[in-house]
Swiss-Prot record:
Organism whose genome encodes this protein: Shewanella woodyi (strain ATCC 51908 / MS32)
Reactions listed under catalytic activity: guanosine(1516) in 16S rRNA + S-adenosyl-L-methionine = N(2)-methylguanosine(1516) in 16S rRNA + S-adenosyl-L-homocysteine + H(+)
Name this polypeptide is given: Ribosomal RNA small subunit methyltransferase J
Record InterPro entries: 16SrRNA_methylTrfase_J, SAM-dependent_MTases_sf
Encoding gene per record: rsmJ
Entry's localization field: Cytoplasm
Length: 262
């Protein structure tokens, strides 16, 4: 796994400074101890978990590619018939390389990797990157999925806009698809928003610079750019997609640059 830390600014977080595993992770990701921080990182049952300190009843956030909802979706989620697979262009004999420019907790990236794509996740927030790294560590060690996870899922830490732009100017980078799922403000009242998502949003905030992602994504992707949006959201950067794949609450806006061929 390749991790590149392009973020020079430090981020304050509360953690047990006498726990070497957490201290090492925080040092690696530029996280500094802050006794008054809103969030805490803990390491329990071999899992790095984020807790919102002023809402202790809320479930902590961690990245788990081995069990739970993502494992169930991998086994029973519909395979290549899923909307995300159609949006990315997965079909018989075609396993596109994908850069997920807004990795978040890595769930969509994992779906694509489980279906055969080689996926590079880009995540700019150091706390989220630390959670992703820990999730990948456990997945890489898993007897069932470890082999293909090590081959297909990688993590890159840095600004999404800068990373996409830099990769687009590199002659060594070949990417079929860029996938984007920028954080969008929820229309519902906060009580209706999933508790985990509420904690996550309070950590990372809305992607106010999301419109700036489309141009470098289009420059990098050789085949298409896929943007996941809530059904009520406007087009990213005001640019109309080539086609739209709608789901119950979201849609995939697809910007086609070239045909997806084997």
């Amino acid at each position: 796994m390749t991790q590149v830390n392009q973020t020079k600014t430090s981020y304050g977080i509360f953690f047990n400074r006498h726990y070497p595993t957490i201290e090492s992770a925080c040092e690696r990701w530029g996280l500094v101890y802050d006794a008054n921080a809103e969030f805490e990182l803990v390491f329990e049952d071999n899992i790095l978990t984020l807790i919102k300190r002023d809402e202790p009843k809320l479930k902590g956030i961690s990245v788990d590619f081995v069990s739970g909802a993502v494992a169930h979706r991998r086994k029973f989620g519909g395979g290549r018939g899923q909307s995300i697979a159609k949006a990315v262009g997965l079909k018989q004999g075609v396993n596109p390389s994908v850069v997920d420019g807004t990795a978040g907790l890595g769930r969509d990236a994992f779906v694509l990797a489980s279906l055969g794509c080689n996926v590079t996740m880009v995540e700019r927030h150091p706390v989220v990157a630390a959670l992703l790294e820990d999730g990948l560590r456990r997945a890489y060690e898993d007897a069932e999925i470890g082999d293909w996870m090590r081959e297909r899922m990688k993590l890159f830490h840095g600004s999404s806009i800068d990373s996409l732009a830099d990769a687009a100017h590199s002659s060594n980078t070949e990417v079929d698809v860029v996938y984007l799922d920028p954080m969008y403000p929820h229309r519902e009242k906060s009580a209706l928003v999933k508790k985990e998502m509420r904690v996550f949003q309070s950590l990372v905030g809305a992607d106010l610079d999301a419109d700036g992602l489309l141009a470098p994504a289009m420059a990098l992707a050789s085949k298409r750019v896929v943007v996941k949006r809530p059904d009520y959201a406007e087009d990213l950067d005001g640019v109309k997609p080539s086609m739209v794949i709608a789901t119950k609450k979201n849609r995939f806006d697809v910007y086609v640059r070239a045909a997806m061929t084997a």
